[in-house]
């Protein structure tokens, strides 16, 4: 859902010059973690379920201990502190439990991906309103036919 949209937005706004990945915290442990290097920016979109967050916190701690990255950004229902972990940016998105009750509570999660895409597009000298130099990507999806069912 949200992580996939953030990854697509970054790739679109950087004209494919920045390649992103998305996964669940558990899924990330099984392979995708191999792409982490000194040029990586990690964005963690954390759950508001405390039982789930235990596993998310463990992965963040493990990555912090074993890797050097450009930055680690955490979006969570409330500001988090993980002892011994240096997080570069913590976005307190909403109150705990709010994601389950309020469909608008996810907006701060999406906004982080939008802002990263926008500023990286500008950093690369692209126009965020029309980042596709080749014209492969447009603001409106084109060429899709709607067929009768």
Regions found by a protein language model. Name each.
Residues 1-149:
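A SIS-like phosphosugar-recognition module
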